[in-house]
């Protein structure tokens, strides 16, 4: 049987391969609502969301999009019920251990950004192992923002630069946007060209606040576990229909 996924295995013909976003960021919103609509525990929505993420990552590789950054766990998410937080930490570790060999084979390089030192020790070890195992891969740069907060990232960068000024290693007038960006978690990444947020919500939720100064934003009226290649196709159609001015006329 032909499915929508097989129909969209290759880049759709109505998309210009030369005008694809180089770097896509995603806020994977709606897992809990997806589960509630089906009378399932919220954690089952997170489990279903993993499948949607795997498919998006495959799609980026198939369609020639070189970088994907996703918002997996924010600094504010610790306020969720303890059982849900514990489930998410265990889920991250399980997915890393289970999917690592496939990521290596598929050429995916995985990075984690955020306040990683505050994560459980076993998860930190899994993260370190996955990043080391995929460091040489070049097919897709897959970045997972975990225990990440955009404001805290900016504060941390300010503190680092302030300490350099205090110690005499840096003059205040030497600080510019380029130097500041080198002190962010994402210093090895280009800024996102396109942000996709699912579930219809229209806010940034403290995500990549510095990096998305000129990012195109697309809000998908679909819950994250239902975000598929057809939905991604629609996002890319919208992106290619825009003229990016970067402040110019």
UniProtKB/Swiss-Prot annotation:
- How cofactor binds (record note)? Binds 2 magnesium ions per subunit.
Could you tell me the superkingdom of the organism this chain comes from?
Answer: Bacteria
Cystine pairs annotated here are: none
Keywords, sorted A to Z: Magnesium, Metal-binding, Transferase
Residues that hold Mg(2+) according to the record: 29, 216
GO molecular function annotations of the record: magnesium ion binding; prenyltransferase activity
**GO BP, one annotated term:** polyprenol biosynthetic process
Instruction: Enumerate the active-site residues.
Output: 29, 77 (proton acceptor)
**EC number(s) per UniProt?**
2.5.1.-
Any Pfam family from its record, for instance, is Prenyltransf
Question: Is Metal-binding among the key words of this record?
Answer: yes
Which residues take part in binding substrate?
30-34, 42, 46, 74-76, 78, 80, 197, 203-205
Cofactor dependence is on:
Mg(2+)
Q: What does this protein do?
A: Catalyzes the condensation of isopentenyl diphosphate (IPP) with allylic pyrophosphates generating different type of terpenoids.
As for family, the record states: Belongs to the UPP synthase family.
PANTHER family xref list: DEHYDRODOLICHYL DIPHOSPHATE SYNTHASE 2, DEHYDRODOLICHYL DIPHOSPHATE SYNTHASE FAMILY MEMBER
* NCBIfam families xrefs: PRK14830.1, PRK14831.1, uppS
Q: How does it assemble?
A: Homodimer.
What this protein is called in its record is: Isoprenyl transferase
Lineage start: Bacteria, Bacillati, Cyanobacteriota, Cyanophyceae, Gloeobacterales
Gene encoding it?
A: uppS
